[in-house]
Amino acid sequence: MDKNNNNNNSNGGHENLFKDLQNQKRVQNPSFSSGQSRTVPSISARGVAPISSSSSSSSISTTNNTTTTTTSGTGSTSSPVSKGVPLIPIGASRFKQQPSTDVWRSARGQQLSESLWSSFKQALQNSQNSQQSLSQSLSQSHSTNSEINNILLEFVKHYNSEYDKWNVEMGVDYANTKVYGIKLYCTPVLDIQTTLYLTRQLCSYVLNLSKALTDDNLDIPDGLHFICLINILSRSPLNSTLLHQENALAHPFQAARLASYKLSSFRDKNNPSFTKWWPYLKVLLANCCQIATNFVHDKQNLSFNSLRYGNVNNNNNSNNNNNIVNSTSLSSGSLLSNGGGISTSEPEISPSTSPLTGTTPTSPSSSWSSSSITNHQIQHQILMQQQQQQQAQQQHTQQYFNTIGQSSSYSYTNVINGVSTNNSTITATTTSNFLIQHIFKLGTISILMDSLQFFNDFFKTLQPKDSEDSFRLLIIDTLGILISGNGGLTTTTTTTTTTTTTTATSTNTTPNTIINNTTINNSGLTNSINNNNGGNNNLNKLKEPGNEIKTIINCIGMKAYIKTSKKVTSLQNEFQFQLHVIRVIKELISNNLNNAKYFNSHRGFEKIQEVILWVTQCFKPTDSHTFTDESCLDFDTSMPAQELSALLIGATSSNSSNNLPNLTNSISSPSHSSSSSSSTTTNINNSNNNTATATTTTSNVIIPPTMYDSLNSVLNSLKYTTYSEKSSSLIKSPPIIVKRSKVVQLSQLFQVLHSFSFTLVPFSKIQTNSSSSSGNLNYNIYSSSSASFINNNNNNNNCNISSPTNQSVNNNNNNNNNNNNNNNNNNNNNNNNVLPRSNSSYSIFRRGDSLNTIIDINQDNNNSNSNSNNSSTLDILNNSQDTIVDNNNGSNIDFEATITTNTTTVVTATVNLTNNNNNNNNNNNNMIDGNTEVTGGSAHNSWSSYTNINEQFQQLSLTSSTTATGSSPTSPTAFQYQSKPIDKMFVNTLLIETIFEKLFSQLNLSALNENHSTTSSLPISQNLSDDSSNTNTNNNNTSFGKIYISDNLQQNPNTDKSLSCGKIFNKIKNSTPELQLQIIEYLIKLVIENPYCLPILRRFNLWELIFSDNFYYSSPQATLNDDDIEYLLNSTTTTTTSSSTNISEEQLKKRKLYLFNGLRLGCLGLIQFFSTFNNRDNFEEICIILTEMRKSLLKSPASVIELCQLLINITKSNPQGTIQSLIKLRIFQQIPQMIQVLFKYEQASNSQFGLLHKKARNIIFSYLGQLIVHEELSYHAVVEKELIDVLFLLLRKVETKTFSITQIFFLMKLNVSSSSPSVTTLLSSSSQVLNSYQQQQQQPQQQSSQPQQQSSQPQQIPQSQLQQQNQTQSLQSSSLSSTSLLLTSQHQQPSTSLLSTSQFSSSSSLLQQQQQQQQQQQQQQQQQQQQQQQQQQQQPQLLQQTQQQQQQQQQQQQQQVQTPSSPQTLASLLGNSSSNTLTSSSSTLSLNESSTLSRLPTSNNLSELYRTYISELSMIKEETSCTYDFKFD
């Protein structure tokens, strides 16, 4: 602006300016009163003409400047209005704030702002010129100051017309509006002259305020508009820097400090002093909160309620009316209802997005909100637009410094952050972090903490309403923005060669203030200095140990005013506040072990549990279950949903599409084709068989034919058995949870908890019993939001991670020893068991787009005592794959990661997971960021100083990358900010324990009784008092169970008061399973975020919880006793009754069954997804499925069908991990045992199986057949004695004969190698048993031959009797050999079989029966000998021949047992004996020698086993005349 323009604005332009402002005030406050008439301009710009309005209750009429109102019930009349008074247009009541914003939506708002600011600067310049000339009198000086003050007041009112009252511009979401962006664009730029004037005025205001606060008789001083002016001007980054340099911010925060102490002194709401000061102090503190957040460059992105913000045009022509464009929403997602949240619609799943949120997964603690666009873009745009104006002001500022005697070298560009650059651009991140530290030194955190403590003390029983609630939300939002905004990476410590670093000194002359015997420094924080290392460790500590974290914790949890009878708006406001608090807690403790320790010691996780419970209790879906009711319209309730789903499993999609409920589509399994390597999602009921033609009708439900209806369809389906290729997609599709009306509040809560699940500190290291005296609430300058922490491998590192409990861990480390002597002298046995609960934790490396991570897995040799390791390299980030390593054997696993970034910075990381048997030596883990040096200190800080909480606790040591290859510490590339850095994260095990072991624990439910004052370690049973040391005092902050009981008794007076809280909690779970469904979605999102969470979830007994009565059930009645069921049926929750007043009981029942059926299918889908995720080992999942199958084998065949189909899907989708799990679990013992149980049950019932039992049996047969034909599993099946027993047992039954013969012949074709350990062991043991049995068999034969030798005359035996005798002897020898083999294999592994004892007893009884049969045969032989003596004379030669044949057969059998023969084919072993021939006229059973699978094992013992098979098959063939034709592809 030149001088002519300034003179016009100061002289002739003032009258027009004030007229415009007065007209604007009239528009902002339209009113009508008696004897007066106000003119309201018509809204012609909107196209709305002024018309007369009439109301149903009252009307306004004006005659001769008199206004009269006539009311007559529902009708009204009005007299004619005068011509000069226009009426308010219809609809104007909906735009109460619209007139004030209309000015800013056009170019007029910017013109008025520029005119007022120019007038203020001209008046200030004239005043200073007059003072220098000493020609102005005192009265003229006062009038000049009054004129300047009035101009500033009008300027503030132009930006905020109600600056002295609580208004919408003080809310947390105002910064996200378009008007805020427009005002930010029009913010003027300060200079030194203006800043000094404002500083003097603020100093006078603070002095007057301090007097008024100490004396209630004094009036409230004038000067609040100066605080508001600083709030408006500090929005510009240029103004913020200058305000800091001139110490203009100290006075506003001193006023806020005085205001917070005044709030702390209030004890009674009816006190006149409280009534006087409370509205004023709210506005003062709110402006100071906004001033503090203005120094955060990413304010909109960090705010939780960030939906959108205004955008401006880059047109610099201020005279153009179209230079300010009303922008649309720039939010990355859909608009969040109720002040933020997530959409209830199902998002589309793409490879680059999260399957639950629909957004790209990011770091859990990388942002304070869900907005994707930062305020830095607007600030950068403002900087570029004001660049020319800044350069024009530099010359004027330089002249001003020369006038007041300052050094000529001190220029405006020298003082911005102490950096002088060659260009005029300023890094917003650098400026923001530098200024935030200055805000911390002004005591902002202590002001916010005192304000929160005021709400905790003053609003114990009453909930804050309206402006009080908005003010409370603003305080916690400010705290979160400051802590999270302080985590940005900076480049202040390192500059390029083109920059020069200077020091901008600013002395703070404000003295210490002593109020209420408490010394308050100018800085509410103290900056810790690491004197040992000679650097700053950047730890900011609050003034009192532990009290601040306790104040924040007391803001959440169950409150006395939280009741189900409250309005939804009141509960929503309380929820939003507590959700903000949880996010602040996450930012505070996610990267600081001290804060985490005190959060746990003050029962922080129990408070989070209370939040989960009261949110589940109080909230319902916003649509009152409308979407759920629409989704369950086709849900059939005529029969149990589980039985219907089981009957439809295996049906073709074309036949079952019209009869299949919606929920049965929830479980998906990948179906793999032999010609395609990619996996596609199919239904669990998918089938490849279309042979079934009949349909079944059950309970008015048409059941289509399925592949498990008969064994013939099962055999046909085995032809199409295929398995997934190893090169297929590793990440399977997550299960689709039941479509329902979600509770938005619960979804938002678990979204925050998910971000809280990954931290930079190991929560397993927290020592709750530590007597640490440091005890301060510490928060890093570079928090978990943006910092990148990875381990340095300069030395051999050893990390002893404790178990996920609260037990203390002592690390005996030798800091002087830099060598890692990890000597393990113990032999580790490979037991193939479940992952042990060793003292280990999993460190997580986050993935980046441009990173290649190689993990070397060095596992100690189990059979060696040396230190040699077997290394294998796995590339886990190429091809977007995660390699998961499970410590199934409990041995040492060393993870060595080498990470290479785009900036050629190589950093290595080592974490050793050791057992208690290992020696823990020196642990030197140096946390290194490859981008910048964020803290000083030595690079040799030991890991023990990080894990041990003591007085010398030091935060993670972050040093500049000295191991970077190809870059120096001063190289720009070495400190370049990476968009997706790798963070070394730890899983928050205490949070998982809170959700799993405490929230759904039966012990927890039983402890919730009437004795609330007793001290207990359980979370809810403890009294939720403000003072954790005094748990016996009764106060208003009672436990969740007591509040719920009292609330329930008011609604149901007839309810027994002795009702336990266990029933109450069961009532919450059983009213609707929304909490369980949210936890399932939380677990899926947790594992997708990082697969390393799955072993930790297994360690916390995830599957025991999922399949327990606390979580997984098909109906609510399955988990409760009779008393609980009666109570639940007679009472309903408030949310259910309020939303279901017009819904019938049948619809309520259908909705409930629909949701719980979705919970059951969701649990099955969860275990299938985790079992196939990343093709990893799924031993525990397979084990729990088999356990549930055994439990449900007889009582619930529908569960058996679902679980067996689940096993089929998992085996086909993930054969790489499943096959090994099945081998460890000895699946060929498990399934035959189930078949034996079903076989005995069918015999004992003396009736045919029902439809479900038969289908359960058939699906088990189908799974067994699929396992037998598997290439690897078939060789384990051929040597499993229990499987062979069951297959020959099924031969005796006509219905299962075909299936059994098919499997037997397939096993007979296998080419088993005699070198395998299982076959060798079986052969050696069976030979010994056969020798013993042959010796026992020879004794009765010798006794029977003695009478024959004594007889002098030979007897003649008929030819038919001789043939029958030969067959009997051959069958006896073969049965003995088969029985000996069975006993041998049974004796080989007695501990692995679940039914080994019963089977051994059955085998011994079989031997006794055979001995009795032998005795009977001997008696028959003696009778035959008497008959033969009569015929000896007739046939002497025939008798001699038969005796010779018998002796020869016995000698051959003895030779076969003692000496093994060479490998032979089946035909050579069988010979030409007619009794053992497989080919006949009535049967086509044949085995070709030319077949590729016609060879037998290389042992006569196995040949004897197959001879037994052949003999039994021949006997069955003679009994039946059926024809079998088998074709093996």
Swiss-Prot record:
Taxonomic classification: Eukaryota, Amoebozoa, Evosea, Eumycetozoa, Dictyostelia
Polar residues composition-biased segments: 24-42, 834-843, 1016-1027
GO cellular component terms given for this protein: mediator complex
Name of the protein in its database record: Putative uncharacterized protein DDB_G0281251
Annotated region (Disordered), positions in chain: 1-85, 335-371, 660-694, 798-843, 1016-1035, 1334-1364, 1454-1497
GO biological process: positive regulation of transcription by RNA polymerase II
Example GO molecular function: transcription coactivator activity
Superkingdom of origin: Eukaryota
Biased composition (Low complexity): 1-11, 51-79, 810-833, 1454-1494
PANTHER family per UniProt: GATA ZINC FINGER DOMAIN-CONTAINING PROTEIN 4-RELATED, LIM ZINC-BINDING DOMAIN-CONTAINING PROTEIN-RELATED
